[in-house]
């Protein structure tokens, strides 16, 4: 069963995926969304999927904090095609052995619209797996794009510990 959530203005959502449970979430950041905090704890042997779709028309802040316990598996997708700034902080703690996390994200980056993503997947136990696949499409009217322009358009920092 798919759990749906529409986010308006500034909201916080706390989710716990119970042991041996399976959950799927579709989260839509609505046009009036300015800030969304998502806190998720995936307990032992759980399986979860999250898809976050940004529709915010103005600057928005997205904060995601996840903790995965032993043999928990979580897959996440984030899609941001809006012509508005996005500040995205994403932190994942793989706390116990066997925890697995995968994120696939796509962003449309345009001139003078700042998209900043700070993403960390921290391996706090042996035999954990974390994968980050981030894609950015750069839409720019002039055909010449310098390295400086690209860095101003989209700043993505990934760290694996």
Language-model region placement:
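Conserved beta-strand/loop scaffold segments within soluble protein domains that form the structured core
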Residues: 1-161
């Amino acid at each position: 069963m798919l759990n749906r959530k529409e986010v308006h203005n500034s909201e916080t959502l706390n989710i716990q995926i119970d042991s041996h449970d399976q959950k799927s979430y579709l989260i839509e950041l609505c046009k009036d969304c300015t800030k969304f905090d998502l806190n998720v704890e995936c307990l032992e042997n759980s399986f979860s999927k999250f898809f976050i779709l940004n529709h915010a028309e103005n600057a928005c802040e997205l904060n995601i904090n996840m903790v995965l316990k032993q043999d928990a598996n979580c897959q996440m997708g984030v899609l941001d095609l809006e012509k508005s700034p996005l500040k995205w902080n994403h932190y994942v703690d793989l706390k116990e052995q066997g925890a697995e996390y995968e994120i696939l994200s796509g962003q449309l980056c345009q001139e003078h619209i700042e998209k900043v993503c700070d993403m960390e997947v921290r391996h706090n136990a042996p035999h954990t797996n974390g994968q980050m696949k981030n894609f950015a499409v750069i839409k720019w009217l002039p055909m010449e794009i310098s390295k400086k322009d690209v860095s101003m358009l989209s700043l993505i920092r990934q760290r694996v510990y």
